[in-house]
Amino acid sequence: SDRLVGSEMCIRDRYNLLSNDQNYHFSYEILKEVGLSSNKIFNAFKSFRGLEFRQQIIFSDKRKLIINDSKSTNYHSLIAALKKYKDIILICGGQIKSNNISILDDSLGNIKKVIIIGEESNTFHKYFQSKVTTVYVQSLDKAVVEMSKFMKTNTDFNTFLFSPGAASFDQYNNFEERGRHFNKLISKLSK
């Protein structure tokens, strides 16, 4: 039987592949069942670029990886991102959907710094302040400025992860608008 080998596929790079491995295997089995050839399936997988704002890689080089996970609107999606990356500078915050922030406890090992934005920043600040370096900046614009400062003063590899873990309605109409704003701010950094 055909085997799906992760190294044969790529939606953008290996980071996204890791989070989608189960989805690929499931999709592969369904598509084989309806009669598509392995070759057609693999070609489709290779050309698939993933969905916007779902751990979307915005930029990557030897020193940094910038990820837009604006779809992260609750703690569970934030946990998924935190467990996946290392050397994280996290931008989080917004309107919290749950008071049970302690469910993040087992997911903090890879965080170097937290930049907090949004309406309910006190909850995030109280939670993170004794665990990791935190800074509160209110807006996404200011968070990206803070991120840029960190980039300029730090030569180690870092993952800059925008994974709010909260809803966007305090400052945006939806997570898509918030995600587009983040991408726009990042594109200005390179100019």
PLM regions and their residue ranges:
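Hydrophobic, well-ordered secondary-structure elements that form the walls
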Residues: 90, 114, 162, 178
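Nucleotide phosphate-binding/pyrophosphate-handling subdomain across enzymes
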Residues: 16-111
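Short active-site-adjacent structural elements
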Residues: 75-76, 99-100, 123-126, 168-172
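Short glycine-rich anion-binding loops that position phosphate/pyrophosphate groups of nucleotides
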Residues: 73, 94-97, 120, 161, ...
